[in-house]
């Protein structure tokens, strides 16, 4: 049966389970992150580098993109496009992560966690590429 919410390619059960977990992690990452853009807008605005204009609009717009991308992951015909969009969005927000690391004194977050965010972002990009783009639909 070719159902839009099922995976596009049949793999071994272990591989399929890993793929579903990976896709679930990406979905939850962007769902929670997108909600945070609206629930904690002022906090999110603090991480927008000063050279990026309109921090309030930037936070709200990226929150919308995160939520749309997360929703798009759930439906196979839109999964690949959502994955490409989330991949691009993750690259686009990299300056905020770098800014937080450069200005660690402004944020009540342990420095090691700010350092860890950059390799975690690389891992997130790989996970998006594997779970949503390559096997997307």
Name each model-derived stretch.
Residues 1-137:
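Membrane-interface extramembranous regions
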């Amino acid at each position: 049966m070719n159902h839009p919410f099922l995976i596009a390619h049949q793999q071994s059960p272990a591989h399929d389970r890993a793929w579903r977990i990976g896709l679930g992690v990406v979905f939850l990452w962007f769902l929670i992150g997108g909600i945070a853009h609206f629930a904690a807008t002022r906090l999110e605005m603090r991480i927008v580098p000063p050279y990026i204009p309109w921090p309030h609009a930037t936070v709200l717009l990226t929150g919308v993109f995160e939520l749309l991308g997360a929703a798009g992951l759930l439906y196979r015909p839109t999964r690949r496009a959502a994955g490409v969009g989330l991949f691009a969005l993750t690259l686009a927000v990299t300056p905020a992560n770098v800014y937080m690391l450069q200005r660690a004194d402004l944020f009540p977050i342990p420095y090691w966690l700010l350092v860890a965010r950059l390799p975690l972002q690389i891992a997130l990009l790989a996970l998006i590429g594997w779970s949503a783009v390559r096997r997307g639909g």
